Amino acid sequence: MNEELNSWDKFCNYLWFDKKLNIWLDISKIIFTNDDIVTLEEKFTDVLSSIKELENGAISNIDENRQVGHYWLRNPSISPSSNIGEEISADINEISEFGKQILNGNIKNKNNQKYTDVLWIGIGGSGLGPLLITESLQKCSKGLNFSYIDNVDPFLISEKLEELAEKLSTTLFVVVSKSGGTPEPRIAMEIIKSHCENNSLEWNSNAIAITMKDSKLFNKAISENWLKIFNLQDWVGGRTSITSSVGLLPLALINENIFEFIRGASLMDEATRTSDFKNNPAALLSSAWYLTGDGVGKRDMVVLPYRDRLQVFSKYLQQLVMESLGKKFNRNGEVVNQGISVFGNKGSTDQHAYVQQLRDGIDNFFCIFIELLDSPSTNIFDGKENPKEYLSGFLQGTRSALSSENRQSITITLEKLNCFSLGALIALFERSVSFYAELVNINAYDQPGVEAGKKAAANIIDYQQKVSNLLEKGGEYSINEITSLIDNSVSEPIFFILREMCFGNEDYLVKGDWSNPNSLVIQKRNS
């Protein structure tokens, strides 16, 4: 056992607590020396300076030539212009008032019925952020019921429509797309809209857009007279959009306090602006990531919240951390292949699953435990074994069992889970991601890999159309013949397209064996 991981002095020396936030951060079970901290401390003057430039409105997403302003959303006074600050404040108040009007029934559907449900259509941060909000904070029988379409899986879409069948007339359809051109929400929106129209159900008067002004979605919502349009600023990225209208509207519609959510995030932002290293939680957390991974992401991040309501948090962090830090090049154009892989579920469930490997298997990770001190106000546990005490015991036991094998971990403790503390927790990780990116000299706010994937997908969709058009002309074609007519470099994608299009589909006659692609000959019937 590494005695350093169980040093009481180290624990006391590096434990961070803020009495305004009632959050603790313990990095003592990360292996490092005081000299390591001194070395990093010297770098943090430049880190804080870079973050300050970002907050002042510097162009931080170079690829898209835009500012990065999600920190302004929770403190409009620091935005680079009074116009931006006033717009943010107006948006927040508009969302709050709209939520009240929906919940108290002042805004109803065309049949004068109160709305009961929300079908949220968004992908990436536009889906994960709202899902985290509702899963973490929605209380029984409060606000509207939420369902999500965050993919173009045909089964998902059909199942959601089936689940909401009797309630579609009282369902708000919220479509989130900053540009309005993202294929997944657009396709899902068109399917849902068509379903409503084909079944004599309202779409336009039940539909809400969250998008940029003058985007394709904005113009569509205007022309079709949708119920509402909420602003999504150009300088807000998807993975950091949770304190924008993307996260605030769900809060308002589940009858939670959006101002407390913003206040928690704002106070955490403020706590991370101090130049006092040991009193800066984002400096401590990002340094722990840096030290345990040798500054090159050698270890995966395993997120273990010991509360079911935070189960989605690990998925949320997957996008926030991996999309921000997974970069091939640093700012000097050098190949660095940076990144931290993130996975997790919840405790104590994971103690009966992969924690076995964490303790006894390959040592390629660090854990982030998240614990809460509160418990529900109820008498159902009186005279019974207290589940809260057991849950705490399981967390401490797992933490101890890991450290006994020199496995590293971080522990974050919240007094309770509410709008305020969730806002603060999210802000802590957002700031830590920014700090880490500065430490390793990468841009946290571009996503060239995502854009490359989108372009490749667009190419495949183009090939799908070309294959379909070719088969419509009639005649038999082998894969080699099809590729020679379309693009000789894409034989494998053509095989995948044909399998998706033709396997089990009686509209096509297929000769040959699917296990031998070169033997396949395909013809469209009746063509």
From Swiss-Prot:
This is Glucose-6-phosphate isomerase. It is found in: Cytoplasm. PROSITE patterns: P_GLUCOSE_ISOMERASE_2 (PS00174), P_GLUCOSE_ISOMERASE_3 (PS51463). The keyword Ribosomal protein does not apply. The active site is at E323 (proton donor), H352, K454. Pathway: Carbohydrate biosynthesis; gluconeogenesis; Carbohydrate degradation; glycolysis; D-glyceraldehyde 3-phosphate and glycerone phosphate from D-glucose: step 2/4. It is an enzyme of class 5 (isomerase). Its EC number is 5.3.1.9. One of its GO terms (biological process) is glucose 6-phosphate metabolic process. CDD domains: SIS_PGI_1 (cd05015), SIS_PGI_2 (cd05016). NCBIfam families: PRK14096.1. The keyword Isomerase applies. InterPro entries: G6P_Isomerase (IPR001672), Phosphoglucose_isomerase_CS (IPR018189), SIS_dom_sf (IPR046348), SIS_PGI_1 (IPR035476), SIS_PGI_2 (IPR035482). It catalyses: alpha-D-glucose 6-phosphate = beta-D-fructose 6-phosphate. Pfam families: PGI (PF00342). Keywords: Cytoplasm, Gluconeogenesis, Glycolysis, Isomerase. Belongs to the GPI family. Catalyzes the reversible isomerization of glucose-6-phosphate to fructose-6-phosphate. Disulfide bonds: none annotated. Its main location: cytoplasm. Signal peptide: none annotated. It comes from Prochlorococcus marinus (strain MIT 9312). GO terms for molecular function: carbohydrate derivative binding; glucose-6-phosphate isomerase activity; monosaccharide binding. PANTHER family: GLUCOSE-6-PHOSPHATE ISOMERASE (PTHR11469:SF1). One of its GO terms (cellular component) is cytosol.
